[in-house]
């Protein structure tokens, strides 16, 4: 590491922790990664490097000192008496040699390993009593996970009853196969929903569903690889896996016991070549000391077991030539460039296009038509240009010129302040109209069954609709003009359109596609102000007064409703008979005055008088907002026994600390 002062190390480490916390929250808790794995890994390893060089800068809440992400408050919490720790990562064979040397030094002799494929999914614990499945839970933060038993019962390869009346806990990986992932994303795209970035996030989003029927539809699978506290007769990893397979668990047939590191390297080479032909995603291999007694001897660090390591595959790259750069217009008018390239085989699929995101990104990469570029798949799924091979750039190459007019309607593009994107601000732009209608009809919005992208394209091409209000004037004769649209389809679509008139107003607000106003914000605003006429008259501060609604959302909403075009559209929808009122449950009665009303509270440690869920509900009934992490916005931290990093962070930030008993005394 280059020379660096203590102050410089503190500053860089603090910046890295902030970024890594945000990325980890997006990955673990929201199932929506914001950066590629290798970017996260590089930043994480840099933080480790700094903390190793300057131990005094390590903080209790550093991501290097904990496992996984925050716990979702919608699920019942599950304690893991034996923590579900994450694994250390290495990225080269030299680092694996160092791991092997470390193992031999610690145990005093050569070590045999059990190797497994590193499945790209999420960790899952299964508990059985007398042979019956009684609980399934996620890893969560390693010590407390989420109860997903109801959902796990819909995963076909999880045994509900074992052939023997055993009381055991096993652990493994829940994943989504490549075929199921492709099918799910195609369905979501057809319905106008955002697609999942990779199978891991699709699996996590599918398992962590409040509605088990959604999980059932998603075709999840498992590989089980750990028996927690196995019986004495089981003395090795490979023996435990064989026995779990006999009990009916789905284990990975590729795992094997290997005598030395040379055999491990052969295994890595074999599956580096085979990975794209597998029916499920892998991102490396896992190396475990096979002898369970040695595992006990080696133990764990605070964060990872000493006896296992994950070797991560490097991203696969291919070279290809950029033949064109095309621009497409989205629902909100954002114009996005895409590189069109000579097709290449990459990570198991043919790739011919890659997003260039925005003009700044395009200029930063320096991509030109005719350039040879290196291409990889972010998360093994999303094609992305890594770099331009400048040594192969044609002699007559010229810099690419960013367009100034919309590719759909020809009007001038604008660059709004504080945005990197180019926008078309013509509300009649055909491309925006098409995307807007697709969004309006999608499941999170008006949920008009049968009105997918292909039908919308035809309606616009045949000049039958120009905005969402026109949908409510469609007739049987209009729909009969569409290709392959018969009487049954016509009747079904007209019925679905008519039924959508009865939707609660928050679905209409969502369907309008207002920038920064998603389904959750729309519901909160509708719940508070009850009808669209009232909402359209609100000022920025009125909307921003709602907890969790920020100024950006409030400003965007008031700006939208101030436009004459928007007001005209709402009036047309009203005249067509659309409901303009909130039909959902009323807001809970206002809580009486108490010390926790309108306060942000964090619970930590083991509570004795209430379960975590019970105390959370009690505080929420008193008007408190209960969150999972401590920050400057936290008003109180209530702690029980064995309180950990949240307690320490509260002390650092000066957040008031209350014991469970002190908190109860203030509310009872």
Swiss-Prot record:
Entry EC number(s) = 6.5.1.2
Q: What is the lineage of its organism?
A: Bacteria, Bacillati, Bacillota, Bacilli, Lactobacillales
Identify the PANTHER family for this entry. Answer: CHROMOSOME TRANSMISSION FIDELITY FACTOR 18, DNA LIGASE
Q: Which residues bind NAD(+)?
A: 37-41, 86-87, 116, 139, 173, 288, 312
Q: Does the keyword ATP-binding apply?
A: no
Organism domain of life: Bacteria
Q: Which HAMAP family would you find in this protein's record?
A: DNA_ligase_A
Kindly report, in one word, the top-level EC class recorded for this enzyme. Answer: ligase
What family is this? Belongs to the NAD-dependent DNA ligase family. LigA subfamily.
Q: Which cofactor does it need?
A: Mg(2+); Mn(2+)
Q: Which BP terms does GO give this entry?
A: DNA repair; DNA replication
Q: Name one GO molecular function term.
A: DNA ligase (NAD+) activity
Protein name (database record): DNA ligase
């Amino acid at each position: 590491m280059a020379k660096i002062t203590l102050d410089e190390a503190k500053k860089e480490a603090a910046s890295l922790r902030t970024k890594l916390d945000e990325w980890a929250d997006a990955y673990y808790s929201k199932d929506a990664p914001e950066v590629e794995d290798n970017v996260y890994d590089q930043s994480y390893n840099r933080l480790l490097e700094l903390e190793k060089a300057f131990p005094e800068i390590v903080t209790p809440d550093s991501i290097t000192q904990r496992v996984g992400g925050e716990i979702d408050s919608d699920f019942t919490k599950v304690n893991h008496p034996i923590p579900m720790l994450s694994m250390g990562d290495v990225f080269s064979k030299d680092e694996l040699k160092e791991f092997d040397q470390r193992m031999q030094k610690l145990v005093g002799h050569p070590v045999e390993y059990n190797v497994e494929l590193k499945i790209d999914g999420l960790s899952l614990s299964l508990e059985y009593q007398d042979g019956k499945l009684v609980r399934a839970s996620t890893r969560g933060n390693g010590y407390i996970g989420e109860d997903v038993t109801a959902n796990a019962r819909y995963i076909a390869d999880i045994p509900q009853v074992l052939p023997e009346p055993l009381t055991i806990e096993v652990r493994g990986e829940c994943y989504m196969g490549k075929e199921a992932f492709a099918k799910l994303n195609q369905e979501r795209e057809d319905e106008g929903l955002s697609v999942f970035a990779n199978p891991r996030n699709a699996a996590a989003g599918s398992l962590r569903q409040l509605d088990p029927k959604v999980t059932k539809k998603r075709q999840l699978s498992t590989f089980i690889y750990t028996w927690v506290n196995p019986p004495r007769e089981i003395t090795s990893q490979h023996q435990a896996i064989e026995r779990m397979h006999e009990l009916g668990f789905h284990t990975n047939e590729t795992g094997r016991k290997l005598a030395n590191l040379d055999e491990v390297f052969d295994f890595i080479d074999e599956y580096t070549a085979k990975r794209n032909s597998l029916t499920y995603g892998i991102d490396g291999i896992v190396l475990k000391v096979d002898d369970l007694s040695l595992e006990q001897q080696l133990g764990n660090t605070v964060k990872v077991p000493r006896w296992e390591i994950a070797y991560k595959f490097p991203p696969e790259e291919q070279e290809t030539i950029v033949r064109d750069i095309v621009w497409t217009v989205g629902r909100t008018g954002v114009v996005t460039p895409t590189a069109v390239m000579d097709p290449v085989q990459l990570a198991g699929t043919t790739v011919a296009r890659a997003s260039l995101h925005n003009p700044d990104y395009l200029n930063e990469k320096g991509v030109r038509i005719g350039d040879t570029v290196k291409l990889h798949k972010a998360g093994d799924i999303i094609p992305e240009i890594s770099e331009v091979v400048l040594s192969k750039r044609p002699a007559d190459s010229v810099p690419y010129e960013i367009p100034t007019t919309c590719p759909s309607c020809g009007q001038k593009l604008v660059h709004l302040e504080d945005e990197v994107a180019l926008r078309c601000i013509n509300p009649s732009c055909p491309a925006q109209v098409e995307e807007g209608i697709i969004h309006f009809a999608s499941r999170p919005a008006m949920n008009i069954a049968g009105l997918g992208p292909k039908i919308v394209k035809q309606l616009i091409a045949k000049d039958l609709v120009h905005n969402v209000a026109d949908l409510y004037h469609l007739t049987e004769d209009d729909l009969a003009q569409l290709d392959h649209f018969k009487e049954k389809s016509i009747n079904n679509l007209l019925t679905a359109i008519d039924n959508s008139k009865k939707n609660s107003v928050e679905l209409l607000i969502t369907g309008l596609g207002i920038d920064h106003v998603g389904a959750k914000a729309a519901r909160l605003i509708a719940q508070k102000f009850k009808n669209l006429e009232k909402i359209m008259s609100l000022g920025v501060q009125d909307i921003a007064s709602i907890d969790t609604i920020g100024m950006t959302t409030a400003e965007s909403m008031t700006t939208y409703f101030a436009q004459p075009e928007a007001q005209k559209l709402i009036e047309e929808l009203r005249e067509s008979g659309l409901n303009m009122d909130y039909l959902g449950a009323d807001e809970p009665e206002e809580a009486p005055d108490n010390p926790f009303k309108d306060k942000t509270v964090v619970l930590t440690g083991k509570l004795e008088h209430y379960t975590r869920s019970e105390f959370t509900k009690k505080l929420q009934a008193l008007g408190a907002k209960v969150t999972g992490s401590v920050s400057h916005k936290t008003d109180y931290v209530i702690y029980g026994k064995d309180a950990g990093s949240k307690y320490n962070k509260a002390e650092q930030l000066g957040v008031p600390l209350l014991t469970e008993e002190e908190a109860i005394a203030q509310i009872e």
